[in-house]
From Swiss-Prot:
It is a multi-pass membrane protein. It comes from Homo sapiens. G protein-coupled receptor that is activated by a major product of dietary fiber digestion, the short chain fatty acids (SCFAs), and that plays a role in the regulation of whole-body energy homeostasis and in intestinal immunity. In omnivorous mammals, the short chain fatty acids acetate, propionate and butyrate are produced primarily by the gut microbiome that metabolizes dietary fibers. SCFAs serve as a source of energy but also act as signaling molecules. That G protein-coupled receptor is probably coupled to the pertussis toxin-sensitive, G(i/o)-alpha family of G proteins. Glycans are attached at N166. Residues 41-47, 112-132, 200-222, 280-346 are cytoplasmic. Highest level in adipose tissue, and lower expression across all tissues tested. Expressed in sympathetic ganglia. This is Free fatty acid receptor 3. InterPro entries: GPCR_Rhodpsn (IPR000276), GPCR_Rhodpsn_7TM (IPR017452), GPR40-rel_orph (IPR013312). The gene is FFAR3.
Length: 346
């Protein structure tokens, strides 16, 4: 007799979901921490507007990764929510907000890059740092305001049933909840995905055209890498996820495959470091220098550990030799006190 939990609300493999979350966490966290160190160092030396935007994007990715273990616990528990309920809407709010923050900041970075190349003289005479700060605040507010729908849905109607009949978190919805959620999702897909995608596509297409006419090969390669990483984010990580919003609005319910395209959207935290890497030659130089320092510290630690092991092994060998030396010394002292015959016989 099957006594396992009812998973009619989720027909997929929850261990696959857990594996994707775990992979994202293990790969994305160290990469974004390295990027955070580089951006903080750059802003302390010579602050640039694009670095302000990318620093906010890094902070957004780290926020997603820090809350990802909650999703991992949920997946390991068969897509049930075993944690205190107050953490359910909070984790959902952080999760979806950071996803859309990436799209907004990528669009802002594309505008910044386009202006610096298409209008270099005008760009240099403008106070970009203050504007970059205001744009960052606007992006955080815009994404947060839209994704606050998580709280509206979770606490609308009968709160006692807000976790669904299976104790789930933001997986099951009543008809009155879907009447609110599906139109909001469609609006989010248009405002927070389609519009940033159009802006980013225009800016980078113009940027490639300008550099193709007279830019250096090194700069062309860097822009090509930046464009590839950005399009990978939009088309692979975010595209299918936002398509599920459109399909859900048309069908009147969330599609069954939505959970899997949501997994794709979490992978953006692993792709964003490549956006940082191709964003500027200065980031590449600082990143390589940081890696050299870390490798040097690792080599120094290994050398010190090896020396400690050798000293420890040498000390053990000396302690093992002391009883034999003591026995030999006592034997020779006995021979010197009149036991020559016995010593000779031995």
């Amino acid at each position: 007799m099957d006594t396992g939990p009812d998973q009619s609300y989720f027909s997929g493999n929850h261990w696959f979901v857990f594996s994707v979350y775990l992979l994202t966490f293990l790969v994305g966290l160290p990469l974004n921490l390295l990027a955070l160190v580089v951006f903080v160092g750059k802003l302390q030396r010579r602050p640039v507007a694009v670095d302000v935007l990318l620093l906010n994007l890094t902070a957004s990715d780290l926020l997603l990764l820090l809350f990802l273990p909650f999703r991992m616990v949920e997946a390991a528990n068969g897509m049930h929510w075993p944690l205190p309920f107050i953490l359910c809407p909070l984790s959902g709010f952080i999760f979806f907000t950071t996803i859309y923050l990436t799209a907004l900041f990528l669009a802002a970075v594309s505008i910044e890059r386009f202006l610096s190349v298409a209008h270099p003289l005008w760009y240099k005479t403008r106070p970009r740092l203050g504007q970059a700060g205001l744009v960052s605040v606007a992006c955080w507010l815009l994404a947060s305001a839209h994704c606050s729908v998580v709280y509206v849905i979770e606490f609308s109607g009968d709160i006692s049933h807000s976790q669904g009949t299976n104790g789930t978190c933001y997986l099951e919805f009543r008809k009155d909840q879907l009447a609110i959620l599906l139109p909001v999702r469609l609006e989010m897909a248009v405002v927070l995905f389609v519009v940033p995608l159009i802006i980013t596509s225009y800016c980078y297409s113009r940027l490639v055209w300008i550099l193709g006419r007279g830019g250096s090969h090194r700069r062309q390669r860097r822009v090509a890498g930046l464009l590839a990483a950005t399009l990978l984010n939009f088309l692979v990580c975010f595209g299918p996820y936002n398509v599920s919003h459109v399909v859900g609005y048309i069908c009147g319910e969330s599609p069954a495959w939505r959970i899997y395209v949501t997994l794709l959207s979490t992978l953006n935290s692993c792709v964003d470091p490549f956006v940082y890497y191709f964003s500027s030659s200065g980031f590449q130089a600082d990143f390589h220098e940081l890696l050299r320092r870390l490798c040097g510290l690792w080599g120094q630690w290994q050398q010190e550990s090896s020396m400690e092991l050798k000293e420890q092994k040498g000390g053990e060998e000396q302690r093992a030799d002391r009883p034999a030396e003591r026995k030999t010394s006592e034997h020779s002292q006995g021979c010197g006190t009149g036991g020559q015959v016995a010593c000779a016989e031995s």
